[in-house]
């Protein structure tokens, strides 16, 4: 039996936006059953609410951003990833700016915040999106694909011509569970190349980026003094991003995801393609104690 989850307590954090460089105050609040994940721009008058839905994605350049009633919410993928990892279904995310705080560039600080607030089960079954047939989208040589699978599994392959990202560290798979997510994926940081800095700054991107919140590489090496958290941290972060992007489907996917050089744009295209084909998926719940749980979530952490 898998129940919906929300926070036990309200919790707050402060940080800077990776791309905007703006300081942002974030408040995470509990929400009722079937409320879903909703972002709230409290700096606007009137306040605007933006549901975490794939169809509202309008920004896919180096982040995933949502727009609703002209209000933007940028760089949602790391928090969305942490919410998926801990099985949180219902939450209100209040922001004083358009972009979520980047924290350390991973989902680890968001996991800590959510666990510190406490996670509680609610009196309603969690709703899953079960993949019924293969759905694939491509863009050049990039591929993102869902296939039917009893559980939730993610595989990802990256290709970078860089000595710090050899082929043997460019492929990773994970059988999704809270334990696997928190240990193997959540601490993997976003990364960028010095050669791309000029491109980003011309587009007002990465203005809040630093070695405190990203892995930075020159042509030969990692420039961060503390090095990497995992030998294959780069591909693990791509899985972290994918978990967040796919959670915008409006529920936890049950199926196998495969990404080859995929990014935010293709991940969003895949979710939209899945949801657009009514024969490709169905809503399911597991509200009988006799039914095996398809995904292992950690016991709720009561703060």
UniProtKB/Swiss-Prot annotation:
Q: Which domain of life is it from?
A: Bacteria
Instruction: Please give the catalytic activity noted in the UniProt record.
Output: a UDP-3-O-[(3R)-3-hydroxyacyl]-N-acetyl-alpha-D-glucosamine + H2O = a UDP-3-O-[(3R)-3-hydroxyacyl]-alpha-D-glucosamine + acetate
Decide whether keyword Lipid metabolism is in the record: yes
Q: Might you report a single GO cellular component term?
A: membrane
Which residues does the entry assign to the active site, renumbered to this chain? 264
**GO MF, any single term:** UDP-3-O-acyl-N-acetylglucosamine deacetylase activity
EC category name: hydrolase
Pathway-wise, it operates in:
Glycolipid biosynthesis; lipid IV(A) biosynthesis; lipid IV(A) from (3R)-3-hydroxytetradecanoyl-[acyl-carrier-protein] and UDP-N-acetyl-alpha-D-glucosamine: step 2/6
- Spell out the Gene3D superfamilies in the cross-references: lpxc deacetylase, domain 1, lpxc deacetylase, domain 2
User: Which cofactor does the UniProt annotation name?
Assistant: Zn(2+)
Residues bound to Zn(2+) are 78, 237, 241
Q: What's the EC number here? A: 3.5.1.108
Gene Ontology BP annotations: lipid A biosynthetic process
Tell me yes or no: is Membrane among this UniProt entry's keywords.
no
Q: What keywords were assigned to this record?
A: Hydrolase, Lipid A biosynthesis, Lipid biosynthesis, Lipid metabolism, Metal-binding, Zinc
HAMAP family in the record: LpxC
Protein function: Catalyzes the hydrolysis of UDP-3-O-myristoyl-N-acetylglucosamine to form UDP-3-O-myristoylglucosamine and acetate, the committed step in lipid A biosynthesis.
- Record PANTHER family: UDP-3-O-ACYL-N-ACETYLGLUCOSAMINE DEACETYLASE 1, MITOCHONDRIAL-RELATED (PTHR33694:SF1)
> What family is this protein classified in?
Belongs to the LpxC family.
Supply the name of the protein.
Answer: UDP-3-O-acyl-N-acetylglucosamine deacetylase
Q: Which gene encodes it?
A: lpxC
